[in-house]
Design a protein with these regions (language model features):
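A short, active-site helix/loop in glycosyltransferases that binds the activated sugar's phosphate group
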Residues: 149, 155-214, 278
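Aromatic "clamp/platform" in nucleotide-sugar-dependent glycosyltransferases that forms part
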Residues: 330
């Protein structure tokens, strides 16, 4: 089967891009031919044999930037210009999607969050129109919904709110939904009467990941630290919902100069760098400048060089050097970094991010130290310290979690879910 994937950006480290890459791996292993249509191929070249670029589909295109600004951030009194803009550029994208479907002879479409979250209005409109026009079987991989983001996608214009309600999420009769947590499945059913398949984030538990080697043994030196330090790794982007301030406060509470916190992600998605500046101020206030490191310039998703000969480390390298991982998020659609830590056999300290963590992950029986509402208690810190300073206990916990992860969040699980979704989509069309 020729399967076409539509996505705003692919190749980076955000959850949508990472999970899409895994879907592609499994779908190819199932014998399907995969073609990708994207607005941006991030941190890697595009393969013209199977991949097609549509610049207007990028979240950072002038067209999308302008419409997001006028719809949600700096709306004008009269939305007519915005509506005309949306109609015009959605038609541009629609025509390119239709051409691509014909040229690649697409049998089934997968819309990667583009039909769920209105972060690119024109792309969502174009996909909606193409799916309805062609009647092609479609899977919408819904990572986030507008109502999960507070008032981020609430406009003062009724016309825009009505439009968002109509287009997102896509609800064509020839489409089926894949959601990433049980809360989303319940909400989709309650709001729209739409059933869905709950597909968790997964990892390939047969790959070598998070293993120490000659290259990543150099990592402490490249960060300016000693090899006998104890490293807590925060392997996420720097955005407010990641709760990184709790990890910084943990370092303060442990009160040990040998404990270092390494934050691997950048703050490119932090609007105005406001959250990043708050973290810097907190580090200064707690006098942790020698213990907390923003090391995003050292890391690339796959450890690729930046082109000038400097060493770049992969996320696997980061996990390999971690004593433990911090993951104090206040909200996640699922939790990619959690599964990565499990795969890397590293203990993890987590915030009970509601409404997802406990029902979809914690209830499986993983051994973690869990805090509530981002607040560290003396008991929490004591439990974390026991793991940090006891390598035997850390290994016991990590090995236990690895076996659970292999059972619930492996490529085998994803393959079963994709077989179900493809069957549902082809039956619905």
């Amino acid at each position: 089967m020729n399967i076409g994937i539509i996505i705003g950006r692919i190749g980076g480290v955000d959850g949508v891009a990472l999970e899409t890459e895994k879907w592609i791996d499994v779908l190819k292993a199932m014998g399907h031919r995969i073609y990708t249509l994207s607005g941006q191929f991030q941190e890697r070249p595009m393969d013209p044999a199977t991949e097609t670029l549509v610049p207007e589909m990028s979240f950072f295109s002038p067209e999308s930037f302008w419409s997001q600004k006028k719809a949600f951030f700096y709306p004008e009194t009269n939305p007519q210009d915005l509506i005309e803009h949306l109609n015009l550029y959605s038609k541009v994208i629609y025509k390119k999607i239709m051409l691509w479907i014909g040229e690649r002879k697409i049998d089934l479409l997968i819309s990667e969050n583009a039909s769920a979250l209105p972060s690119h209005l024109e792309m969502g409109m174009a996909i909606n129109k193409a799916v309805n026009k062609t009647g092609i079987p479609t899977i919408t991989h819904d990572h986030d919904f507008a109502w999960e983001r507070g008032d981020r996608y609430l406009s003062p214009h009724k016309d825009i709110n009505d439009f968002v309600e109509e287009v997102f999420p896509l609800r064509s009769p020839n489409s089926v939904h894949a959601v990433i947590n049980s809360h989303a499945a319940d909400t989709l059913k309650e709001r729209f009467g739409r059933s869905s398949v709950n597909v968790p984030n997964v990892m390939d538990f047969n790959q070598v990941f998070g293993v120490q080697n000659e290259k990543n043994a150099q990592l402490p030196t490249h960060m300016g630290f000693s090899k006998d330090n104890l490293f807590l790794f925060q392997i996420t982007r720097i955005v407010r919902r990641k709760g990184i301030e709790s990890a910084i406060r943990l370092v303060h509470e442990l009160d040990d100069k040998k404990v270092k916190l390494i934050i691997t992600g950048n703050y490119a998605d932090d609007a105005g760098s406001a959250y990043y500046n708050e973290l810097v101020n907190l580090i200064h206030e707690l006098k942790l400048g020698e213990q907390v490191s923003f090391a995003y310039d050292l890391f690339h998703n796959k450890g690729l060089s930046n082109g000038n000969g400097e060493i770049r480390f992969s996320l696997s390298d980061a996990y390999a050097q971690a004593t433990a991982c911090t993951y104090f998020s206040t909200y996640e659609g699922f939790g990619n970094a959690f599964v990565e830590a499990v795969l890397a056999r590293r203990p993890i300290f987590v915030n009970n991010y509601k409404p997802v963590y406990q029902p979809d992950i914690g209830s499986k029986g993983f051994r973690t130290v869990m805090i509530e509402n981002g607040e560290l208690t003396k008991e929490n810190v004591k439990q974390m310290a026991e793991i940090i300073y006891n390598p035997g206990l850390a290994k016991e916990i990590a090995d236990f979690n690895f076996e659970l992860g292999k059972k619930y969040f492996s490529y085998d699980t994803l393959r079963e879910k994709l077989e179900e979704l493809i069957s549902m989509a082809t039956s619905a069309a």
